[in-house]
């Protein structure tokens, strides 16, 4: 028990407490900001809750006509979209019996089809099992209620990932700090070695998880009670639209009683996993990169893999599936396990039980054994290892960064990742219309002139004749199928031409508009449609920059070599100058790997014909000056990202100078560089303008 008390005291240092309090305060502040900020659909979270409060007094028979009436009389776009959303949710609640009937009907259809085909496989078993599960919900009557308060607690992505960052910081303080200071070496000669100590650290992590969960989600619950309509804990869980397809016959109160134990268990697994990474890796750079890559890969698997994919097990055997706990209750999904439908909730339960046991055993026993670093030399190499000695400070710093600083390994891993992440881009079309649209753009490529307008008018006359011919055939009694087959190519071209003329109408508002096929440039410059790619690139860029900068500076502070330079004639001036040069070269390398490779890949597939055209010719860049070309705009974006990378490297250098600890520097980078980017990924309004985000993302105009 004394060891446990000591470990708790270690967590209560001024630095750790201040960081955790900062994150604890940041969570409700961002939650309140998001609640009062207009979203992309034109309304706020308070507007959504207020509309539910207004319709709560209407009976089940009158609520839909009332919402429909409000939608018809609404004038603002935001109000219309808000009413449309609430109408959809209310309709789903009031027609829940029809939803249950559709589940049974689908099961019957699959059963009949499999009887005729003679194949009683997974599909039939899955349909029958799903029907049996949902038959238990007969008699459930969902209510039209405001679910904002509940979702603020159970479906708050921002809170979930703030908790992940807090667990990472606690794992660093519990395990890596003592390990990096060689304090654990003192315990090798004791009777039980480090086993009892590591068991105590695991117990403290479990206690910290429980406390963090109660604080973070308890604060969210207080916000829900103060700013949203009251939650009726006796209402069926299916009253909440997110949990409309839930197979569990639970009230909202019972759901909350099940939700938090599952949430805590998932966080315990993640916290122990972070502790295992800290125990297994000796370098803070590797700890940071391994933890960041693990969370990113888990999040990518959870969000991008389809539930029907053969890789679906990676979606559901996933720590993030448990961290985003509400999804365990919102859907009923079975995966194919040798022809037997196994529920993903059961699968995840088995997964976390096994993983928690493995992590506790590994964390407790790994550091108990002796791990000595051995220098391996090839035969005959030792005699010649001193040949070619030099006194170049620059080459010495290069060696320290590449080998002790692990930058060489990081660059090799980054290069392999870039090769996998950026396969050869090919010219692709979303539809047949787009093929014809490109043909038109290539045909009329160039400035929009009077001659171009004449050619467009001639083409428009052709489609006017086409409309006359179709009208004539319809008068002759020709069927619609006959007309679609006869004029298939012409109709496809007409859709492309209509899209072209709409774009021409926009170009006429400019002093000098250009016609060119802009899809490749949309990929590089459109922050709306390709926002996720920009954010993902910024994450990779930042992780690589932090790892390289820590490798350049970290070796000197890890072995306290920096103290030896105080008594030299020039102090650290020349030394830091060389490190700045290496930081610049590292930034150039990271920038080339993340952005230049992608740029060359896209331009090689879609061509460079539009680089000289005004950037404003693309409709999403209507704010950009017409004097700036597409090529210049892309250059501006790239320059912003490069400057952002330099600032990240300078930030890491400055943190090393003032904090003198690799662990403290990593925590600072997570708080001030990684976390703001995470807010962009979470969809927090205007987060792209925080700190270094405008420079790192680039596409903010």
Regions found by a protein language model. Name each.
Residues 8-23, 284-286, 398-413, 662-663:
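Membrane-interface helix starts
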């Amino acid at each position: 028990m004394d060891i446990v008390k000591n470990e708790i005291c270690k967590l209560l240092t001024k630095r750790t407490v201040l960081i955790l309090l900062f994150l604890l305060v940041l969570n409700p502040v961002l939650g309140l900001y998001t609640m009062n900020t207009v979203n992309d659909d034109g309304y706020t979270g308070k507007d959504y809750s207020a509309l539910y409060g207004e319709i709560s007094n209407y009976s089940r028979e009158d609520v839909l006509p009332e919402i429909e009436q409000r939608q018809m009389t609404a004038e603002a776009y935001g109000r219309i979209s808000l009413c449309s959303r609430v109408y959809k949710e209310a309709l789903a609640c009031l027609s829940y019996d029809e939803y249950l009937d559709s589940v049974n009907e689908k099961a019957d259809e699959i059963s009949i089809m499999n009887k005729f085909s003679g194949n009683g496989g997974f599909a039939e078993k899955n349909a029958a099992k799903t029907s049996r599960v949902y038959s238990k919900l007969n008699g459930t009557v969902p209510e039209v209620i405001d679910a904002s308060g509940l979702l603020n607690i159970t479906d708050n992505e921002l809170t979930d990932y703030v908790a992940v960052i807090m667990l990472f910081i606690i794992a660093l303080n519990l395990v890596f700090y003592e390990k990096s200071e060689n304090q654990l070496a003192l315990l090798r000669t004791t009777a039980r070695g480090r086993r009892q100590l590591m068991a105590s650290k695991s117990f403290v992590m479990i206690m910290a998880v429980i406390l963090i969960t109660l604080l973070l989600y308890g604060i969210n619950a207080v916000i829900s009670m103060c700013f949203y309509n009251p939650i009726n804990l006796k209402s069926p869980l299916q009253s909440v639209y997110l949990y409309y397809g839930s197979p569990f016959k639970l009230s909202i109160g019972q759901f909350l009683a099940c939700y938090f134990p599952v949430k805590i268990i998932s966080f315990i697994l993640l916290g122990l996993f972070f502790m295992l990474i800290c125990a297994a890796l000796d370098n803070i750079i590797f700890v940071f990169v391994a933890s960041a890559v693990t969370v990113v890969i888990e999040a990518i698997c959870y969000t991008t893999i389809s539930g029907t994919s053969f890789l679906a097990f990676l979606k559901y055997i996933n720590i993030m599936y448990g961290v985003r706990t509400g999804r365990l209750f919102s859907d009923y999904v079975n995966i194919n396990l040798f022809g037997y439908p196994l529920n993903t909730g059961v699968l995840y339960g088995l997964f976390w039980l096994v993983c928690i046991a493995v992590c506790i055993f590994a964390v407790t026993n790994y550091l108990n054994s002796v791990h000595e670093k051995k220098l391996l030399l090839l035969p005959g190499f030792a005699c010649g290892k001193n040949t070619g000695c030099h006194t170049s400070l620059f080459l010495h710093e290069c060696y320290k960064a590449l080998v002790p600083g692990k930058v060489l390994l990081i660059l090799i891993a980054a290069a392999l990742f870039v090769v996998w992440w950026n396969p050869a881009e090919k010219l692709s079309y979303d539809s047949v219309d787009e093929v014809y649209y490109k043909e038109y753009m290539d045909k009329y490529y160039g400035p929009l002139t009077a001659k171009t307008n004449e050619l467009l008018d001639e083409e428009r006359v052709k489609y006017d004749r086409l409309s006359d011919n179709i009208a004539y055939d319809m008068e002759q009694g020709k069927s619609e199928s006959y007309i679609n087959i006869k004029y298939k190519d012409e109709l496809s071209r007409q859709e492309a031409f209509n899209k072209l003329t709409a774009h021409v109408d926009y170009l006429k508002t400019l002093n000098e508009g250009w016609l060119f096929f802009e899809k490749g440039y949309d990929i590089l410059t459109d922050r709306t449609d390709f926002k996720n790619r920009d954010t993902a690139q910024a994450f990779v860029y930042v992780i690589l920059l932090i790892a390289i900068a820590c490798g350049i500076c970290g070796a000197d502070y890890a072995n306290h070599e920096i103290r030896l330079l105080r008594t030299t004639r020039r102090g650290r001036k020349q030394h830091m100058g060389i490190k700045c040069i290496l930081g610049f070269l590292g930034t150039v390398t990271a920038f080339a790997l993340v952005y230049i490779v992608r740029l060359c890949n896209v331009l090689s597939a879609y061509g460079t014909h539009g680089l000289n055209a005004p950037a404003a010719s693309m409709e999403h860049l209507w704010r950009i000056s017409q004097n700036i070309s597409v090529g210049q705009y892309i250059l501006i974006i790239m320059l912003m990202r490069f400057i952002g990378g330099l600032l990240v490297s300078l930030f890491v250098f400055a943190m090393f100078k003032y904090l003198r600890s690799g662990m403290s520097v990593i925590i600072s980078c997570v708080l001030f560089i990684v976390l703001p980017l995470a807010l962009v990924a979470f969809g927090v309004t205007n987060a792209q303008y925080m700190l270094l985000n405008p420079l790192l993302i680039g596409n903010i105009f």
